[in-house]
């Protein structure tokens, strides 16, 4: 007899699990945290069935713990994702995602005339959240962009 509730993605002993990522966003999260360049084992589930979301992505990273700062950056891509820190196969800590007030050196400014493209300065955005409409305002050119425009380019 086979078990009907078998895990589709293997459990990890120690590390981080990022769950409830909207489908087709998991690859962007990998790049955000530069997980495609790590030596640790990363397990990715794409378009997994989800009763709440229809389909979701999932990322498990062994021996790497997502920080609260990283979890807050994740909120730009997946505001309802969950981040669990795993120790000895058990959830040791659940991180709450909150949108950061500022984001530095993560995204490029979409404005091709912005000085961040030609000067040796890190990009810097202020996060604006009005009625769940998330926008990013560039510190240098002061232009405001939708979250989708900024995150799609990176």
Swiss-Prot record:
Zn(2+) binds at residues 109, 114, 138, 141. GO terms for molecular function: metal ion binding. GO terms for biological process: 'de novo' pyrimidine nucleobase biosynthetic process; pyrimidine nucleotide biosynthetic process. One of its GO terms (cellular component) is aspartate carbamoyltransferase complex. Pfam families: PyrI (PF01948), PyrI_C (PF02748). Its cofactor is Zn(2+). Keywords: Metal-binding, Pyrimidine biosynthesis, Zinc. Binds 1 zinc ion per subunit. It comes from the Bacteria. Gene3D superfamilies: Aspartate carbamoyltransferase regulatory subunit, C-terminal domain, Aspartate carbamoyltransferase regulatory subunit, N-terminal domain. InterPro entries: Asp_carbamoyltransf_reg_N, Asp_carbamoylTrfase_reg, Asp_carbamoyltrfase_reg_C, Asp_carbatrfase_reg_C_sf, Asp_carbatrfase_reg_N_sf. Contains catalytic and regulatory chains. Involved in allosteric regulation of aspartate carbamoyltransferase. NCBIfam families: ATCase_reg. PANTHER family: ASPARTATE CARBAMOYLTRANSFERASE REGULATORY CHAIN (PTHR35805:SF1). This is Aspartate carbamoyltransferase regulatory chain. It comes from Photobacterium profundum (strain SS9). The gene is pyrI.
């Amino acid at each position: 007899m086979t078990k009907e509730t078998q895990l589709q993605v293997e459990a990890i002993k120690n590390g981080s699990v990022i769950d409830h990522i909207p489908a087709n966003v998991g690859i962007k999260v990998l790049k955000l945290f530069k997980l495609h360049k790590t030596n640790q084992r990363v397990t990715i589930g794409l378009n997994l069935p989800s009763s709440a979301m229809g389909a979701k992505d999932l990322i498990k990273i062994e021996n790497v713990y997502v920080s609260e700062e990283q979890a807050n950056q994740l909120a730009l891509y997946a505001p309802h994702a969950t981040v669990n820190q795993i120790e000895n196969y058990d959830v040791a800590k659940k991180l709450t995602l909150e949108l950061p007030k500022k984001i530095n050196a993560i995204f490029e400014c979409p404005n091709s005339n912005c000085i961040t493209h030609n000067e040796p300065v890190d990009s810097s955005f202020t996060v604006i959240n009005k009625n769940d409409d998330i926008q990013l305002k560039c510190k240098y050119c002061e232009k405001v962009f939708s979250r989708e425009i900024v995150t799609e380019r990176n």
